[in-house]
Amino acid sequence: MKKLSIILIGLFFCMSLQAQLRLTLGRVIEMAADSSLTAFRNQNMYLAGYWEYRTYQANRLPSLTLNLTPARYYRYITQRYDSGQDIDVYREQQMFSASGGLNISQNFDLTGGTFYIDTDLDYMRNFGSQTYTQYSSVPLRIGYQQNLLGYNPFRWERKIEPLKYEKVKKQYIYNTEQMSEEAVSYFFELALAQAELELAQENLISTDTLYKIGVQRQKIAAISQADLLTLRLDHVNAQNTLQNAEIAVKRAMFSLATFLNIDKDTDITLDLPGKPTNKTITVEEALAKAEENNPTYLEQEQNVLEAEQSLDRAKMEARFNASVNASVGFNQVADKLSEAYRHPLRQDLVQFTVSIPLVDWGVRRGRVNMAKNNLNVVRTSADQERQSVEKEIIVTVSDFNIQQRLIASAEEALDLAIQAHEQTRQRFIIGRADVNSLTLSLNRQQEAQKNYIQALRNYWQDYYKIRRLTLHDFESGFSLSDKFDYAVGMYR
């Protein structure tokens, strides 16, 4: 029984150790990039864009296609001409056939045409009063087809698809930095809650001690009954504040654990980052890096190109369309397979088609006008988005440079508030300070603690926001894309 108790105690101790986690801000950001659901979503969004670009590249390469019809059987009544009777008659016909072909094609971006090489073989066997077998072969055929005056999608894909993939890569890093911002928010939400809990615990002990001192002093008439009741009220309020602080910590801890995709019952303790080193970022430098890296600029450029593509398509479809298909090759037909490839005959094809819209009651012209108006809207929206990004950068950089001074000021205020409260507390104990002064000094200390943590929070949120908007690490001086590993979604 004793051994069992020891084992159970040991297991409980191990479980307690496993459920505890001490984290820094940097570690929280690393864990978010490694295991959070947001990171998983970001990676799959990138992979979707990656494979879309790979598909575009594959479409630019020669394609090899095998077309097969292994078996086809017909049995039906058909109308035929009987030369002996000089009349049309209905006859039953049975036929089995099979076919196969191999095709190689290559698209040309510049012209919008397709070059192809193919070979075909067909087999046919008729059943009935006259059974016969035939093979038809095309040993080789080389051809080219394209629209002469129509819309060329290949030319536009060549402009848009590489830009889309570059935007996808930048967007992946952008989303990762946005996730870092979320991590900062969750981190300091819990840090602030834990700091308030710690203050509430200290305040409860302090108010309890002061109330007991007040009871003793009231007995000798050193303080009034009203002051004693105020001390009692402070103690009761401290108990309520402690309970609310415990609830806030549990909520903040649960939110952080959920975001990091770890056990929701994990007991997380945070280490606040120290005072950051002074780093001034100029607005001009931030704007230059944003124009170079921010995916919003690439997205707007893509939107304009796609609108221009739609306008080009509408204009081309409003005109007459002409296409050409030309091929040269060989073919043969025979009763035996081997003879179907002997002495092939020349096969030539030149086909020119024209489609001219005569009357459409303004449909095509309407499509062109809609495409023009849409292009104007897209260009205006692009300018607005750029201005919005620039405004956000200017405001954030200005706030960031100010936050560094605010942290130093908040830290100094916290030190002074702690010293002032301790001195007021000691003066109250010896009867040289009243209850109002003591309460005021405690409130100032709590407010200074909140302001300091909030200053740290604002600084790091602005720091990672600038990283997100510019995709540049101003502390190390390198572009984030240079250090980003797209395979794992983390920095090398």
How would you describe each model-predicted region?
Residues 1-25:
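Bacterial Sec-dependent N-terminal signal peptides
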Residues 29-33, 84-89, 223, 227-228, ...:
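Amphipathic alpha-helical coiled-coil scaffold segments and their short linker/junction regions
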Residues 30, 34-40, 47-62, 101-134, ...:
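A glycine-/polar-enriched beta->alpha junction
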Residues 41-56, 175, 179-200, 216, ...:
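Amphipathic alpha-helical coiled-coil segments
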Residues 65, 72-77, 264, 276, ...:
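Acidic, low-complexity, intrinsically disordered peripheral segments
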Residues 68-142, 270-280, 312, 325-356, ...:
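Small/polar, glycine/serine/threonine/aspartate-rich low-complexity segments that form flexible
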Residues 159-163, 167-289, 399, 403, ...:
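Periplasmic alpha-helical coiled-coil/stalk elements that build and connect Gram-negative outer-membrane
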